[in-house]
Amino acid sequence: MALFYLLAIAAALLDRVTKLLAIHYLRDGAQSIVIIPDWLKLTYAENLGIAFSVRFLPPTGLLFLTLAISAGVVWYVHKSNNRSPLFLTAFGLILGGGIGNLIDRVMLGHVVDFIYFDLYHGALFGIPLDLWPIFNVADSCITIGACMIVLFHEKIFTRKHA
């Protein structure tokens, strides 16, 4: 169980530190920082929605939804008897990412995003399109945790019979 909380705290702290750096160095109209030309750059963005900046609830609603999901993850992990490292890692990453974005919503009223894979920027049928959204460390943790659950679901959720 310690692994679950340790990963959640580490993910939330890493997310917070990177967002503070993004706020300090990228906000206020600063130029993007190119990491890999034509591929990866750091660009400041304020996200009032959820993934892909989708807005389906007002900011207060998203705050409470994030809080409810985070509480649900903690409840589920505690209720489950599963203590496999994969299970605890996946859900620890999801919780840490949720807490990281929750901190932003409480403190700022939006989520700070700054990682941008510039895979395609143009138009599709005349509609402006960026192939990949700007995201953050918390989003990455949530995505990695969810992918672990999908990819390793048999190992994570199959009970061993004695």
Swiss-Prot record:
Pfam families, sorted: Peptidase_A8
UniProt family annotation: Belongs to the peptidase A8 family.
Pathway: Protein modification; lipoprotein biosynthesis (signal peptide cleavage)
Catalytic activity annotation: Release of signal peptides from bacterial membrane prolipoproteins. Hydrolyzes -Xaa-Yaa-Zaa-|-(S,diacylglyceryl)Cys-, in which Xaa is hydrophobic (preferably Leu), and Yaa (Ala or Ser) and Zaa (Gly or Ala) have small, neutral side chains
GO cellular component, one term: plasma membrane
GO terms assigned for molecular function: aspartic-type endopeptidase activity
Function field: This protein specifically catalyzes the removal of signal peptides from prolipoproteins.
Membrane topology: Multi-pass membrane protein
Places the protein is found: Cell inner membrane
Residues at the catalytic site: D113, D139
Keyword terms: Aspartyl protease, Cell inner membrane, Cell membrane, Hydrolase, Membrane, Protease, Transmembrane, Transmembrane helix
Top-level taxon of the source organism: Bacteria
GO BP term, pick one: proteolysis
Chief place of localization: membrane
Transmembrane segments: 56-76, 84-104, 132-152
EC number: 3.4.23.36
Protein name as it appears in the record: Lipoprotein signal peptidase
HAMAP family in the record: LspA
